Amino acid sequence: MLLSSVAYADTCPIPEGGSAALGSMDAKDRIELLHATFDSQAVYAKRWKWAWFGIGMTTLAGSVGQAVGWAAFVDESNPKREADIIDNVIVSGFSVVGPFVSLIFAPSIEKDAPAIDQLLKDTGGGAAGSCLVIARMEELMRRDVSEEEFNVGWFQHVIAVVGVGALFGILFGEALGTSDPIAAQEHRNNAISNSLVGLVLTELQILTSPSGAIGAWNRYLGGRFSAKKTAAFSVAPMFGAAGLSFRVTF
């Protein structure tokens, strides 16, 4: 049981890359700043995860629905019928990856935030062993920042292009494998349209991926803790609906 006389340390050691300004900051202020960053970024990460899960499931349902629709309601004499059934089945196979990746590889900061809440609860808001509390918070934040940097880095864009390129290649290959010119053109049309949509959605998913901890961590290391708030513009997937949300935060 913690005693009310437990007090915060005046100052705590500086993490690697930290400035002298950070070292002179009160332990309590450092804890509060890190805690606020965990909380705000966890909220965004959760919304991002479920928004893109919803977008992915909508895309999957659309592809499956079109395949079923062409199979059930379009006359077999229609030269586009088989091409659209095949292409939508292929697109469905690619679409199933997105929503489950959003869940399996959800940003770690979403689960780290509750762990920090529990840590602060167990230590009286960080007063008991404040420097150890800060060290643990910094450890988790550094890991989450590294993850965010990877998730928005160039490699993710390469993966996006490769994945969409594979989809385009498979659909275009179907066009090369048919002798019916109408069916071949339908395959080509589907290759172009689905690849463009896939690339746009994938890039938007990367560009809206949680990255706020990166800037917050750099400001923390630099000891820039001015109470003055600045405006920040961001684009995010809408939570609970298809579309994008443009927002300005202060």
Predicted feature descriptions by range:
Residues 55-62, 91-95, 158-166:
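Mid-membrane cores of alpha-helical transmembrane segments in multi-pass membrane proteins
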Residues 41-76, 83-87:
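N-terminal Sec/ER secretory leader and immediately downstream segment
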Residues 79-94, 183-197:
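Hydrophobic alpha-helical transmembrane segments
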Residues 66-71, 82, 86-108:
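Glycine- and aromatic-enriched membrane insertion/assembly motifs of diderm outer-membrane
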Residues 67-77, 171-180:
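Juxtamembrane "helix-exit" motif on the non-cytosolic side of transmembrane helices
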